[in-house]
Design a protein with these regions (language model features):
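Intracellular effector-coupling site of seven-transmembrane GPCRs
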Residues: 212-225, 236-239, 256-299
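Alpha-helical transmembrane segments of multi-pass membrane proteins
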Residues: 75, 105-118, 146, 184-195, ...
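Seventh transmembrane helix
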Residues: 247, 289-304, 322-375
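Loop architecture of class A 7-transmembrane GPCRs
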Residues: 48-57, 125-147, 169, 175, ...
Length: 375
């Protein structure tokens, strides 16, 4: 879902590195490996020169001074913002409700993605030696990266369902904190299960014994059938369409419920406060889903194009690496926005922020509030 392909190979190119003539265990020289690559043209293994796969990497290295600071900025902003959001929700018992628990689950997924997956993936994209973190992490990082996307999707869906229940059935007892914890655990387990097919086809190939100073960690799906395309379509629906659909259905259902149960006449102050509070919470949900959808749209479209065009007729190999990095950077930036959206719509979070930034001033305000409450 959020993968950057460093070593772009058409499906047929995998034969070059996995057959008996060119395996990591052989003592084949670099020249022999190059001849094997050149020979693939005459054998009809690919419609273009397999050495073209390295052209995009050369172009990508030119943009390295631009992309690395941007990625560092994303990691710092998302790391600090989501850590602060988690600290606010976990430290204040008044914030322990269903919506905030699901928001903390969303923040935990974004934090995990930005602090673990993004640095390793970016290092792989820009390191001329390829994957430098060993075989276990080669399989684990793509799994976590894909799973965190599903965690975000399912958490946003859970928030949408919770908002509908609160508005449409206000007298119904809300789910407990322990119940929310169980749902959050289920979200993580389901996300790992949905991400598993991708990790099953990850291959770790060390080409250094063959005279090529490169370690490859990539997806290689079977040649026969359309498993990769089917999984991409499933991922597009499950990780992109579901949150948009859930929020749309929730919004329509809430609108119908409010019109159905609205009481004629001037609403009381308590009703106005209740309506305003619910409107703010739903605005938070809509803003989060829109930010997620807009950030992930370029990468979703690009991944679908690559699956439909494995021979790179639509997008040339020279530009595909740079395009992947651009789309990946925009997608990863989605982890930065939720803390700001939540803080702008939640007064208690803003109070916590003031407390962290100006602790002395916060203590004075607390003393004034206590004095006024005693009087």
């Amino acid at each position: 879902v959020a993968e950057i392909s460093y070593f772009l190979l058409a499906s047929s190119d995998m034969d070059i590195f996995t057959d008996g003539d060119f395996s990591a265990s052989d003592n084949t020289s670099y020249e022999t490996g190059r001849e094997r690559l050149e020979g693939s043209k005459s054998q009809g293994l690919n419609h273009s020169d397999p050495l073209d796969m390295f052209i995009g990497i050369e172009l990508l290295q030119r943009f390295k001074p631009l992309f690395l600071p941007l990625y560092c900025l994303v990691v710092v902003v998302a790391g600090v913002g989501n850590s602060f959001l988690l600290a606010c929700i976990l430290s204040d018992k008044k914030l322990h409700n269903a919506t905030n628990i699901f928001i903390s689950n969303l923040a935990a997924g974004d934090l995990l993605m930005c602090l673990t997956c993004v640095p390793l993936t970016v290092s792989y994209a820009f390191d001329s030696h390829g994957w430098a973190f060993g075989r276990p992490l080669c399989h684990l990082v793509p799994l976590l990266q894909c799973a965190t996307v599903f965690v975000s999707v399912l958490s946003l869906t859970a928030i949408a369902v919770d908002r509908y229940v609160v508005v449409a059935h206000p007298v119904r007892r809300r789910i407990s904190v322990w119940g929310c914890g169980a749902v959050s655990l289920g979200v993580w387990l389901l996300s790992l299960a949905l991400a598993a097919p991708q990790s099953l086809y990850i291959r770790y190939m060390d080409l250094r014994p063959n005279g090529i100073d490169l370690v490859v960690c990539e997806e290689f799906w079977p040649h026969t059938g359309n498993l990769r395309l089917l999984y991409s379509c499933f991922t597009l629906i499950a990780s992109y369409m579901i949150p948009l659909l859930s929020v749309s259905v929730s919004y329509c259902a809430i609108t119908v419920s409010l019109k159905r149960y609205s009481v004629p006449g001037e609403p009381s102050n308590s009703q106005q406060r209740w309506s305003q509070r619910r409107r703010k919470t739903f605005s938070l949900l809509v803003a989060s889903v829109l930010a997620f959808a807009l950030c992930w749209l370029p990468l979703q479209v690009l991944n679908l194009l690559l699956d439909l065009d494995p021979d790179f007729y639509i997008i040339g190999k020279r530009y595909i690496n740079v395009l992947q990095i651009c789309c990946h950077l925009v997608a990863m930036s989605s982890a930065c926005y939720n803390p700001f959206i939540y803080a702008s719509l939640h007064s208690k979070v803003r109070l916590h922020l003031k407390g962290y930034l100006c602790p002395c001033r916060n203590r004075q305000s607390e003393m004034v509030e206590r004095a006024m409450s005693r009087s």
